[in-house]
UniProtKB/Swiss-Prot annotation:
<feature type="disulfide bond">
    <location>
        <begin position="222"/>
        <end position="248"/>
    </location>
</feature>
<feature type="active site">
    <location>
        <position position="186"/>
    </location>
</feature>
<protein>
    <recommendedName>
        <fullName>Extracellular metalloprotease TRV_06892</fullName>
        <ecNumber>3.4.24.-</ecNumber>
    </recommendedName>
</protein>
<keyword id="KW-0964">Secreted</keyword>
<keyword id="KW-1015">Disulfide bond</keyword>
<keyword id="KW-0325">Glycoprotein</keyword>
<keyword id="KW-0862">Zinc</keyword>
<keyword id="KW-0843">Virulence</keyword>
<comment type="function">
    <text>Secreted metalloproteinase that allows assimilation of proteinaceous substrates. Plays a pivotal role as a pathogenicity determinant during infections and contributes to the ability of the pathogen to persist within the mammalian host.</text>
</comment>
<dbReference type="Pfam" id="PF05572">
    <property type="entry name" value="Peptidase_M43"/>
</dbReference>
<dbReference type="GO" id="GO:0046872">
    <property type="term" value="F:metal ion binding"/>
</dbReference>
<keyword id="KW-0645">Protease</keyword>
<feature type="glycosylation site" description="N-linked (GlcNAc...) asparagine">
    <location>
        <position position="200"/>
    </location>
</feature>
<feature type="binding site">
    <location>
        <position position="189"/>
    </location>
    <ligand>
        <name>Zn(2+)</name>
    </ligand>
</feature>
<keyword id="KW-0482">Metalloprotease</keyword>
<feature type="binding site">
    <location>
        <position position="185"/>
    </location>
    <ligand>
        <name>Zn(2+)</name>
    </ligand>
</feature>
<dbReference type="InterPro" id="IPR008754">
    <property type="entry name" value="Peptidase_M43"/>
</dbReference>
């Protein structure tokens, strides 16, 4: 899933003065069918696996730089892990930082040669999370991540994970998006979550989660309230899977937590 920013003025490299998130990709074709089939194919033992102790995900952070552009100190990398652990505590998920790497490569730091970069840097298994922090993602993107797939090939495993704009880490220079919540949003896709809003402007159950009301449009900024589909509850403007400013995001729902657990069992546990 892709986040992008629409610039409204000139900004220094790696920083954004004013921006709005937009999306440049959609989930895989017929993904909900794949999701359901993967769940139904689980053994009784796997389907009923006890996750009351939560899910702990081995996490690898990769910092891509072009000279000094894009460098992130260890303190901010740890702050990003801490932020994700705080955000996902509502969903029973925690992230264990296994290793952080730094690579000076101007091509990769500009978001080019994704396959070559991941072939060189990817670590762990399909149950591991790799996040690549890139200062200049193409087209002003804030982040890109991939949904989990059934029976992943070796190529799918290597291409898995998230690419996130470097300036969105806690204390980064991307105005309105520098509390680490871009990574939190992107990892939601890694765990099988959709956006809470409809991609085509309709008032349908776009995210397959019962306790997020129908929402026909993304949220911009941080409004006091928004109700794009009257009658079913106000929009989920504070949800991590909307497009609000970081300061506005503070919620995963129990339904989303349940979908994360289902997704983990179906696609990533044991891989």
């Amino acid at each position: 899933m892709r986040f992008s920013v629409l610039l409204t003025g000139l900004a220094a490299a790696g920083s954004i003065a004013t921006a709005e998130r937009t999306c440049g990709a959609v989930p895989p074709r017929a993904y909900e069918k794949e999701f359901t089939e993967a769940l139904n194919s689980l053994s009784p033992e796997a389907a009923s696996a006890d996750l009351t102790a939560g899910i702990t995900i081995d996490t690898y952070l990769h910092v891509l730089t072009s000279g000094q552009t894009g460098n992130i100190p260890d303190s901010q990398l740890q702050a990003q892990i801490n932020a994700m652990n705080q955000h996902y505590s509502q969903a029973g998920v925690q992230f264990r930082l296994v290793k952080a790497t730094r690579t000076d490569n101007a091509n990769w730091a500009s978001g080019r040669d994704e396959a070559g970069m991941k072939k060189a840097l990817h670590m762990g298994t399909y149950s591991s999370l790799n996040i690549y922090f890139i200062p200049n993602l193409s087209s002003g993107l804030l982040g890109i991540c991939y949904f989990p797939r059934a029976n992943p090939s070796q190529t799918t495993i290597i291409m898995d994970g998230c690419m996130v704009r470097s300036g969105t880490v806690p204390g980064g220079e991307t105005t309105n998006y520098n509390q680490g919540k871009t990574a939190t949003h992107e990892v939601g896709h890694f765990l099988g979550l959709y956006h809470v809003f409809s991609e085509n402007g309709s008032c349908v159950d776009a995210d397959m989660v019962a306790d997020t009301p129908a929402q026909s449009k993304k949220t911009s900024g941080c409004p006091s309230s928004q109700d794009s589909c009257p009658g079913g509850g106000v929009d989920s403007i504070h949800n991590y899977m909307d497009y609000s400013y970081d300061v506005c995001m503070n919620q995963f729902t129990p339904g989303q937590a349940n979908r994360i657990a289902q997704s983990w069992r179906a696609f990533r546990a044991g891989h």
